[in-house]
């Protein structure tokens, strides 16, 4: 099977479907995150998005202010709908990086920087800029992914 889109990867690599679960991925990376129905532990800006989104492109994602004092409301899905989760909001550059596997390690091959002019639209970037691939120290479990 030729893997072009996320739905192809879902079918081709069932052992790695956890990667499509963005809540699980966020928690594995140590981010402050939780599912709809679980209150935040810190007041601040969060990204709210579907737990699963095989369409990609940030569909359904939006920036939202969440407050620890909204505990009861959040427990009753007043701010986060079922099937969605919240995760701490990150600032800084947005990279899209292609990796290749070399000697059982994932190394960056190509990269672009996505430019947003506003946080109001998380689906599309205003433009992309090709850059030299940045190097990030990936968690050990990432290198165990063998596709």
Which residues does each predicted region cover?
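Active-site nucleotide/adenylate-binding loops and adjacent lid/helix of ATP-dependent enzymes
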Residues: 7-142
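Long, well-ordered mid-to-C-terminal structural blocks that present hydrophobic/aromatic surfaces
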Residues: 143-147
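General N-terminal leader/first-domain-start detector
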Residues: 1-6
């Amino acid at each position: 099977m030729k893997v072009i889109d996320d739905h192809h990867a879902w079918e081709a690599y069932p052992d790695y479907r956890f990667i499509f679960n963005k809540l699980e991925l966020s928690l594995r990376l140590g981010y402050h995150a939780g599912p709809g129905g679980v209150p935040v532990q810190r007041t601040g800006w969060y990204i709210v998005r579907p737990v699963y989104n095989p369409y990609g492109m940030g569909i359904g994602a939006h920036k939202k202010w969440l407050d620890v004092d909204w505990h009861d409301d959040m427990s009753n899905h007043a701010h986060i709908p079922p099937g969605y989760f919240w995760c701490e909001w990150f600032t800084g550059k947005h990279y899209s990086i292609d990796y290749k596997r070399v000697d059982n390690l994932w190394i960056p091959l190509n990269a672009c920087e996505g430019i947003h002019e506003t946080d109001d639209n998380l689906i599309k970037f205003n433009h992309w800029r090709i850059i030299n691939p940045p190097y990030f120290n990936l968690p050990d479990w990432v290198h165990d992914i063998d596709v």
